[in-house]
């Protein structure tokens, strides 16, 4: 009987530990921890672009803002950047601005990436990850669509096709 009791006791302990680990894994990796939600005002920030110019989100009120959080080490980020560049000129004329927020990488690494893809939209580096933390961004890429009134319209996590980028830009294009 002693062996049987020990077996069930060990099995019970193992089950409790497994459930605890499973819950921890789920809450850390799958639960929506984003602080940015559709219908809320976008959090203001000021970051410098690669030319040293300050970009403040609040100053873009009146325009739709396509706020993309990315990293050079992120394959989906790398795939979506050419789509964003392709549509940037057309939608900039219609009142949509792209701001690509890099996740704290060295400026030289980011500049090489920008040069390789010929990106012309503003690229800023979130040194210290303050903006990423303020928006609760996990994982990369994440794109936040902000309308001309500074309100978050949509939060998209994951890569985007060219069609998705175009649909998202249409969604935040200011009304004429």
UniProtKB/Swiss-Prot annotation:
GO terms for cellular component: plasma membrane. Pathway: Protein modification; cytochrome c assembly. Pfam families: AhpC-TSA (PF00578). Belongs to the thioredoxin family. ResA subfamily. Its main location: membrane. PANTHER family: THIOL:DISULFIDE INTERCHANGE PROTEIN DSBE. The gene is resA. Signal peptide: none annotated. Keywords: Cell membrane, Cytochrome c-type biogenesis, Disulfide bond, Membrane, Oxidoreductase, Redox-active center, Signal-anchor, Transmembrane, Transmembrane helix. InterPro entries: AhpC/TSA, Thiol-dS_OxRdtase_ResA, Thioredoxin-like_sf, Thioredoxin_CS, Thioredoxin_domain, Thioredoxin_ResA/DsbE_sf. The keyword Hydrolase does not apply. Residues 36-176 form the Thioredoxin domain. SUPFAM superfamilies: Thioredoxin-like. Disulfide bonds join 74-77. It is found in: Cell membrane. It comes from Halalkalibacterium halodurans (strain ATCC BAA-125 / DSM 18197 / FERM 7344 / JCM 9153 / C-125). This is Thiol-disulfide oxidoreductase ResA. CDD domains: TlpA_like_family (cd02966). GO terms for biological process: cytochrome complex assembly. Thiol-disulfide oxidoreductase which is required in disulfide reduction during c-type cytochrome synthesis. May accept reducing equivalents from CcdA, leading to breakage of disulfide bonds in apocytochrome c; following this reduction heme can be covalently attached. GO terms for molecular function: antioxidant activity; disulfide oxidoreductase activity. Coiled coil: none annotated. The chain crosses the membrane at residues 11-30. It is a single-pass type II membrane protein.
């Amino acid at each position: 009987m002693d062996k049987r009791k020990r077996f069930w006791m060990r099995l019970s302990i193992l089950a409790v530990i497994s459930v605890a680990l499973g819950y921890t894994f789920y809450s850390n990796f799958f639960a929506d921890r984003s602080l940015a939600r559709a219908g809320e005002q976008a959090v203001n920030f000021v970051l410098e672009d690669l030319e040293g110019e300050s970009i403040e989100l609040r100053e873009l009120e009146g325009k739709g803002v396509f706020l993309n959080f990315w990293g050079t080490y992120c394959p989906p980020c790398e795939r979506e950047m050419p789509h964003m560049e392709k549509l940037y000129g057309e939608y900039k004329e219609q009142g949509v601005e792209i701001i690509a927020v890099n996740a704290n990488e060295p400026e030289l690494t980011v500049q090489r990436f920008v040069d390789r893809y010929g990106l012309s939209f503003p690229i800023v580096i979130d040194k210290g990850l303050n903006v990423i933390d303020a928006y609760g961004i996990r994982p990369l890429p994440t794109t936040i669509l902000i309308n001309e009134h500074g309100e978050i319209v949509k939060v998209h996590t994951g890569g985007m096709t060219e069609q998705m980028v175009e649909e998202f830009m249409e969604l935040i294009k200011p009304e004429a």
